[in-house]
Amino acid sequence: MEKFTQKWAIVSLLEDVEEGSEFYFTDFPLHVTLAGVFSTPADKDQLVHGLAGLLRKQSLIEIEADEADFFGPNEDIPVMRIKQSGELKKLHLQIHDWLTSLHVEYNSPQYQGSGYHPHCTVQRDTSLSLGEQRVLTSVSLIDLFPNNDGYQRKIVKTIQLG
């Protein structure tokens, strides 16, 4: 029996998905991860208000799909790496520093902060193409344990950029 606990992630969705939407973990919309899976003693309201304050003056960020690759312990998760721009790195580090102040524990801390590798995981029905350019227009807080269900995901809050 798997044991699930409250976890969160912060992403920039590349598809239009309404705030409050729930979906099965295998149906995650196309996105760029800005903060990987984490737990924290902070509650949902603290996360929502803190993230909104942090992003208050954040401008849109242009991204470009740079290289196909495989992630994961078995290198079997197909991803499209995103070119690491100064703006994207700065956004990740701002989020990382803020989360550090909330005493988060990451599932994979080696990929946060200086170990951040921006990417877009290939989803069932969609992915980025090599060289494809997009604009990050929002940042979303994702609940990875809505209604005590570790297989569901919920978009708790989406904050528009720019």
Whereabouts are the PLM-identified features?
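Basic, often amphipathic N-terminal segments
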Residues: 1-64, 70, 85-143, 155-162
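Extracellular/luminal beta-rich ligand-recognition
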Residues: 73
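Short histidine-centered catalytic/ligand-binding loop motif
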Residues: 76-87
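A two-mode feature
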Residues: 148-152
